[in-house]
Each structure stands twice: as C-alpha cells, then as structure tokens.
Amino acid sequence: MKNQDKKNGAAKQSNPKSSPGQPEAGPEGAQERPSQAAPAVEAEGPGSSQAPRKPEGAQARTAQSGALRDVSEELSRQLEDILSTYCVDNNQGGPGEDGAQGEPAEPEDAEKSRTYVARNGEPEPTPVVNGEKEPSKGDPNTEEIRQSDEVGDRDHRRPQEKKKAKGLGKEITLLMQTLNTLSTPEEKLAALCKKYAELLEEHRNSQKQMKLLQKKQSQLVQEKDHLRGEHSKAVLARSKLESLCRELQRHNRSLKEEGVQRAREEEEKRKEVTSHFQVTLNDIQLQMEQHNERNSKLRQENMELAERLKKLIEQYELREEHIDKVFKHKDLQQQLVDAKLQQAQEMLKEAEERHQREKDFLLKEAVESQRMCELMKQQETHLKQQLALYTEKFEEFQNTLSKSSEVFTTFKQEMEKMTKKIKKLEKETTMYRSRWESSNKALLEMAEEKTVRDKELEGLQVKIQRLEKLCRALQTERNDLNKRVQDLSAGGQGSLTDSGPERRPEGPGAQAPSSPRVTEAPCYPGAPSTEASGQTGPQEPTSARA
C-alpha cells in the first residue's frame, strides 16, 4: 500500500491538471485521516454535553451520526484516490498507444526510464502485485523471459528455413534444366541475367517487407509492455477495492443496528400519536354533528333557490325559441334580398355610370347588413355557450352549499345583462329592416327610371333613322345639282366673247363644292349637320350598350 501511495503522489505531481482539488494520497495522509476523524467525534462529545439539558438519546444519536459521517467520508476519499490514480495512469498511457500505431518505433527501455526521471525527478516506481514487486524491465528475470522467447522463435524458424532450402533446391534444378535446353552460352548468360534481375527485385521487396514487419514488432513489444503495466495497476486497484468493500460492509452493519434502534423509537412515538389522534377524532365528531344540523337548513334553502332557477331557465328557453324564429324570418328576408340584388345587378349592367355608382353604394350597404347578420349569429352562439356555462354553474351550485348566495346574485346580474343585450339586438333588427325596405324602394324606383329612359332611347333612335334618310336624299340631290353646274360651266368656257352677265352663273358654279355644307344647316333647323349625323350613328349604340 505504501508503494502504491508513493506512485499516486508521483502521478499527481506529473499531472496536476488531471485531478484538481483532490487531496494528495500518501502514507502520511492515509495515516492522518483516521486521526482527524477521531478528534471530530471527540469535539462533538463535549459540545453535546454543554447543550442545555438535552436527552441522553439525542446525544448518542448525534455522536453516532457524526462517527458514521466521518467513516463514510473517509471511504469516499479512499475510493476517489483509487479512481484518480487509475484514471490518471490510463490517460497517460492512451496517447502513447495511439502514437505507436501510426509512428515509427520509439527508443528502447533505457531511454523511456530516462524520460520518466527527467519528467518527475524520481525513479520509475515498480508496481506491486499481491504484496510483491513486479520485476522491472532491466531486471535479470525479464532478460531470462526474453531469452526464452527468442529460443522459441528460433525453434519455430528452423523448420521454415528447411522448407526454404528445399524450395531453393527445386528452383536450382528447374534453372539447370532450362539452361540445358539452351544451345549457346550467350543465351544461357542472358537467361541467368534475367533470373538474377528477378531475384534482385524479389530480394528488395522482401527487405521492404522485413522493415515493415520489424516496425510492427517494435510497436507490438511496446504495447505488450504497456499492457503489463496496466495489468499491474488493475491488480493494485482490485486489492484496494476489496479492502474498501470490507470497510463498507462494516459500515452497513452499523447502519442496520442504528435503523433497528430508530424503528423502536418511532413505534413508541406512533403509539403516543394514536392516543392523541383518538382524542381529536372525538372532538371532530361533535363538530360534525353540529355542522350536519346547519347543512340540513342550508339544503332546504338551496332547494327553494333551485326551483326559482328552474323557472328562470324555462323563461329563458321560451325567449330563445322566439329569437330563433326571428332569425329564421331574417334569413328568409335575406334570401329574398339576395335574389332581388341578383336581378338588379343583371338589369344595372347596361345602365350609365351614375346608376352604377348608386348600385355600388347599395351593394356596400347589403354587404354591411350581411356582416351584421353574421355578427348576430355569432352573438347567438356566444349566448348559447353562456347558457351552457350557466347550467354547469347550476350543477356546481348544488354541490357547493356555502357559496350559494354569491353565485345566485352573480347569476341574476348576468341574466339582467343578457336581457339588455337582447333588447339592443331587437332594436338593431328593426333598424336593419327599415334599411332593407328603403333599399328595396330605391331599387324599384331605379328600375322604373330605366324603363322610361329605354322608351325615350327607342323614340330618339327612330327620329335619328328618319333624319339619316332625309340627309341621304339631300346628298343625292346635291350631287345631281353639282353635275348640272359642272355641265353648264363646261358649255360657258367654249364662248370666249361672253362678258359680265354670262360670268354670273359661273360664281355659284365655282362655289358649288363648298356651298352644300352651308345649305345643309338651314334646310332642317332641328336636324344636325351631315358630319354630326354621321357621328351620332355610332354614338347611340354605345349609349344603349352602357
């Protein structure tokens, strides 16, 4: 144990970061811990004696609990020391194993011991197995073991060498046979050179393989040494854990004895508590009888209140049926209004912009009314939910006897609020009915105006057609007159001797192309010009389409 404690101290010096805050595990520390636990128990003893008039049983319990705590703390410390030393050694050995797999062979055992001394300033500790030191790497026992391993390797190699010699003899005979087949010495030399080159390549490959195998062998030797060290550490940890288990068994026995004593004391306390509990039960029974008398009176009052609530619920159901009928009537009116709106939309598609604006305004009002109807439906659902809540409250009212008066007052207030809301809703329904009636009247007036205007448009179209016919007849007459004037002007140019009186008819003949435009306007004071009449033709259909 002392050698292991020294090893733990050296490991903590080499790796102070791996176990911060842990106490140093040395021979002196291990000897001082029990001595420190004993004064703690002694310190508790006089303190308990100085306490003012404590019972002797309580003092004994405190002393036993303090001693058990000290023992448990000491055992936990020992366990932490074992785990810390073993885990620290494993952490130190882990990176070496990883590095040995991918790197070349490390220096020999002498160099390892030197590096250990350079790091810690102490010689490498020798592990202890079952109270005896394990032989170090430089001891003669280990050298004998290695020599025996080498002798076994040689014995294993001899049959392999014999097999190789037999194989070489066969190859030589085959080579001689091939050389005998050749006729000239030059061919024999060439064959030998080829064979020699092949053997050289094989020899080089074998040397490379030998180097790789040697590296692997050195790595395996290092791993073997490392595993031996870990095995020794595991054996030491096992021995320490066995000792700890024994101490824990002793500690468990003492805990069992304490548990038995506490159980006896608790039984005595339980008997005292039962006697006190019976006395309190008798008092409670007397109080229960008094409360039963009060509860009987409260039940009668609650029955009367329940009858009143039933009457209120029946009245509320009747009012609900009336509201349902009103809503059905509203739905039917809404359907009629929707049908009328569809007809009005079909009729108003061909109206002018003013009619279209008024129609949009009416449609907006209809949408708002629908929205209000939906809000009314939502309020209806909300009222139904409130009714369900009131029924649940009524059931709770029967269960809770003490809070019956408060619940009844709150229910009355809520019923009054509901009646006020219903009155408000009825007023709103009357308002919306009046609005719907006004909108229907406006729609009927618009339809009558449209029919009147359609009749006026038909009369105007008939007048326009008559005017167009008259204009066409006038245009034909004008064309005939123009032709006659042109003929007359052509006959007048032949006689150059004619003077002023013969030139007068040429004036209107020369102005004839421009005169018809002037003559068209006074012919029909009520009719428009030809250009205007030409434009009115396509304009009227557009107005009709609108």
Curated annotation (Swiss-Prot):
Residues 186-491 form a coiled coil. GO terms for cellular component: cytoplasm; cytosol; extracellular region; membrane. Signal peptide: none annotated. Residues 70-80, 143-158 have a biased composition (Basic and acidic residues). The modification Phosphoserine is found at residues 72, 515. The keyword Nucleus does not apply. Keywords: Coiled coil, Exocytosis, Phosphoprotein. Pfam families: Taxilin. Ubiquitous, with much higher expression in heart, kidney, liver and pancreas. Transmembrane segments: none annotated. The keyword Phosphoprotein applies. GO terms for biological process: B cell activation; exocytosis. InterPro entries: Taxilin_fam. Residues 11-21, 530-546 have a biased composition (Polar residues). GO terms for molecular function: syntaxin binding. Residues 1-170, 482-546 are annotated as: Disordered. May be involved in intracellular vesicle traffic and potentially in calcium-dependent exocytosis in neuroendocrine cells. Belongs to the taxilin family. Binds to the C-terminal coiled coil region of syntaxin family members STX1A, STX3A and STX4A, but not when these proteins are complexed with SNAP25, VAMP2 or STXBP1, suggesting that it interacts with syntaxins that do not form the SNARE complex. This is Alpha-taxilin.
